[in-house]
Amino acid sequence: MAGGEPRPTETGSTPVDHRYDASLSVNLQDLRDFFLTYQSVIGFAGINGLLALSVYATLSCGQLSLANAGFMAIGAYASALLTVHASLPFAVVLLAGTVAPALLAVPLGLPVLRLRGVFLAIATIGFGEVVRLGFVNWEYTNGALGLVGIPQRAGLGSILAALAVTLFLFLRLRGTRTGCALEAIREDEAAARTMGIDSTAHKLAMLTLGAAVAGLAGALEAHFTFMVSPGGYTFGRAVDMLVFAVVGGTAHPLGPLVGAAFLTALPEILRAAGSSIGIPPGPLRLFLNGAILLAVILFLPEGIASLWRRYGRRRVREGHAA
Amino acid sequence: MLLELERVSRSFGGVHAVDRCSFAVRQGDIHGLIGPNGAGKTTLLNLVSGLIQPTGGSIVLAGRRIDRLPPHRIAALGVARTYQNIRLFPDLSAISNVIAGEHLRRRDTVLESLLLLPSARREQETARERARALLARVGLLERAEERAANLSYGEQRRVEIARALAADPAVLLLDEPTAGMNPAEVSAVGRLIAEVASQGHTVLLVEHNVKLVMSICRTITVLDFGEVIAEGPPAAIATSPAVIAAYLGAKP
C-alpha cells in the first residue's frame, strides 16, 4: 500500500526526533511527579488489587467466602513478627505470610465448604471474627494496639511485582483443565460433579489460593504502613474486598484489579476534581463516592470491566451493519 | 451385564419413589426405561449417577458397586448423563459446555500452563477440536460460540448430549432427550442415539416418546409407582397386559 511512496520521516529526521525527545522527557518528568505524589495511592491500589483477586479466587468457582480479612490478618501478623523478631530476608517473610494462612485454609475449608451460598458466607464471617478477636486478646502481639514500628520493607516495586505474579497465575489458569472445571462448578455444581469434576477438591484449592493471596497482601501492607492491628481486619475489610471484585467484574481476572484501582483512586479523584470545581471537602464527597458506587452496580451489573466488552460488541455490530 | 440394579429402593419421607427395582443393562445395548409420570424414572437415573443415594439395594457397574460413591467417582468409572430439565452451564458458550464435559479425558495441568509449555496450549487446542467434532456430530457446529442460554430448547438438548459424550462414557444416561422437540428433531436424535450405541457406548434411555423407544431400544424396562412391572424386547412390551393397564388404566 505504502510501497510507492517515499518515506517523509527519513528525510527530515533530525528535527522530528528532537521534538519527540523533548515531549518524551516532559512526559517522563510528569510521570515521575505523578508517581511521587501518588505513591501511596498506587501502593494501596496494588494491595487492594491483590485482595480483590483473593476474593475472585473463591468467586471463580461460585463460592462467596468472607474469610479473607482473617487470612490477611494472619499473613500480616506472621510476616510482621518474622521481620521484627528474626531478621529474615523480605522474600522469606513474604513467603511465610503467604503460606501461613494457606495452611489454615485447608482445615477451615474441609468442614465449611460443605455449606452453600449465604451459609458459607456467614461461617466465613465467623472465622474472620475469631481471628480478629484472637489477635485482640493476644498479649504477645500487643492486643488491640497491635504491632507498630515495623520496618518499611515493601514499596511499589514489591507490591506491583506480587500483583503481576498473582495476575499471571489467574490468567494462566483460564482454559486449562482446572480452569474449565472451576467455571463448570460456578455454573452448576451438581452437573459438574456428574461430569467427573471433584468439586470439593477444586473449591478447597481455590479457598486456599485465596487465603495465600490475601496473606501476601496482608504481609505487603504490614511492611508498607509500618503497622498491624486487629482493627485493620474487620468484617468491613472483607466486604471492601468483595466490593472491589464485584464492582470491577468477575468474568475475567482483570475485573477485580480494575475495581480495586477505581475504588482506591475514587476518593483522590473526587478530591482533585472537587477542589477544582468548588465542592467542599467532607460528607458531600463521601456521598458522591457512594453514589458512583451505586451507579456502577445498578448500570453495570457485570462490573466496570464489562464496559470494554460492551464497546467491543457495539463495534462489531456496527461493523456488520456497515 | 454392564450395569446391574439389585432391589434398589429410594424413599423420600414416606414416598417410595423407587421400590426394590431390579434390572440389568447389557453392554452395547440401548435400554429403554419407560413408565407413566411419577413412576420413578428420573429418580433411578439420579441414583445411578450418584446425585442421590439409595435407601436399599445395590447398583453394580462392570462388577463394581457404585451406590455409595460420590457423583464424580461414578463419572470417572464411565457414567455420563443428560437431564430432563436441561442443566447446561447457561453463561458459557456451547463449545465451552462441551469442553467442560471433557474433564475426565484431559491430562493438562495448571503447572504446564504456568511454565508456558507448548503442551498446555496443544492440550487446550485438542480439547477444543474434540468439542468442535462433537458439536458437528449433533449438528450444531455453527452455534459453537453462542451462549448456551440463547440456544433453542432442542439445540440445548443436543449440546447436552454432546457434553455427555465428551467424557467418552461407557454408559450414557439420557433423561427424555427428545422432550419438546419436533418430529424431525426427534428422528435426528433417534439416529444419533443408535449411532452412539453402535460405537460401543451403552445407553440407558428414559423417554416418553413410545414410538422412538419401540424403534431403537433392544430391551425395555417399564416402571410404575417405583416398581418394575415389565421387562423385555419392544414387541413383548407393546402387548404386555401389565403395561397396557399401567398406561391406560386396568379394565374394571
Enumerate the predicted regions with their spans.
Chain A
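Short, low-complexity intrinsically disordered segments enriched in A/P/G/S/L with frequent Arg
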Residues: 6-7, 18
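Local alpha-helix boundary/kink/capping signal
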Residues: 12-15, 262
